[in-house]
């Protein structure tokens, strides 16, 4: 089976819906995280096995901490490799972030965009690729604190690591938009103009919250608006949170269209939804929209992976 077209992240909440889909449908592949599924058993694993027989599988890591200082988690790598091999997957990606510092942090944190960080992350990616026996892809992440020691912008950093490590680029369109709005440092469209399009081989699209559930707008003594999030004040006109719990916004759909126009091939593109699940028909409609855009901009061959 080939990994191509439009996909939807496989979640336990959606298991029955996946199994009830007709053979000819818009969802052409699924994605899971090895951290969640390597040791899963029981009915959940049985249902996943059934889905994996019908759909090609992409494997997307959450906590390998490619930007971290601790040694790579060899047990996680072994579990990831076993999952890839068991389901004959041909694709693995991870986040450009770190999530450990003398313990697991349960969040994906950014590092300074520096040449030193490029060398560090690239070497760890090469180690992962050697262990897994395949080229992996690196995903741009959403982040909420920009390091003042950075010497390059986000897309330059991503390109430099991908070139140094000789890996693919997993483009998250929603993250590009969220970072562009929150930091105002890099226009999302300029990001897409500058990304190494020849390395882009996978795309995520998702929804975001335009105002955090814990946020309230207040006025300071100078009558300036601040966003108050969990007691901290941020001098921002708005704060976008990459939640994967909402429908995709129109501005992000527009950005996906622009990405398709820029790319020489149309990569497999996955809709992420992690909670606050609507009726399955609404998710399916979003996947259909991805497929329609892929068809609209299929000016060249469609990228695929043999699985």
UniProtKB/Swiss-Prot annotation:
It comes from the Bacteria. SUPFAM superfamilies: Xylose isomerase-like. NCBIfam families: PRK05409.1. Belongs to the UPF0276 family. PANTHER family: UPF0276 PROTEIN HI_1600. This is UPF0276 protein HI_1600. Pfam families: MbnB_TglH_ChrH. It comes from Haemophilus influenzae (strain ATCC 51907 / DSM 11121 / KW20 / Rd). Coiled coil: none annotated. Transmembrane segments: none annotated.
């Amino acid at each position: 089976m080939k990994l191509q077209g439009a996909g939807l992240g496989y979640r336990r909440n959606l298991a029955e819906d996946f199994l009830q889909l007709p053979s000819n449908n818009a969802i052409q592949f699924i994605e899971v995280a090895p951290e969640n599924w390597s040791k899963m058993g029981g009915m959940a694993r049985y249902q996943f096995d059934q889905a994996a027989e019908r759909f090609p599988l992409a494997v997307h890591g959450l906590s390998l901490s490619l930007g971290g200082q601790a040694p790579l988690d060899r047990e996680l790598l072994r579990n990831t490799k076993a999952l890839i091999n068991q389901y004959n997957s041909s694709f693995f990606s991870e986040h450009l972030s770190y999530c450990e510092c003398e313990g697991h942090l349960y969040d994906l944190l950014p590092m300074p965009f520096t040449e030193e960080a490029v060398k560090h992350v690239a070497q760890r990616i090469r180690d992962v690729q050697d262990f897994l026996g395949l080229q992996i892809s690196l995903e741009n992440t959403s982040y909420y604190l920009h390091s003042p020691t950075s010497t390059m912008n986000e897309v330059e950093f991503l390109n430099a690591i991908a070139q140094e490590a000789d890996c693919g680029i997993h483009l998250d369109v929603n993250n590009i938009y969220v970072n562009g709005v929150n930091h105002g440092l890099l226009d999302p469209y300029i990001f897409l103009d500058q990304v190494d399009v020849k390395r882009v081989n996978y795309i995520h699209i998702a929804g975001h919250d335009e105002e955090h559930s814990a946020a309230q707008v207040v006025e300071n003594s100078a009558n300036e608006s601040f966003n108050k999030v969990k007691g901290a004040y941020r001098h921002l006109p708005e704060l976008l949170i990459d939640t994967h719990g909402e429908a995709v916004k129109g501005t992000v759909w527009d950005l996906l269209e622009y990405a398709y126009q820029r790319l020489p091939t149309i990569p497999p593109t996955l809709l992420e939804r992690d909670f606050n699940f609507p009726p399955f028909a609404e998710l399916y409609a979003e996947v259909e929209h991805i497929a329609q855009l892929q068809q609209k901009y299929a000016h060249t061959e469609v990228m695929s992976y043999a699985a």
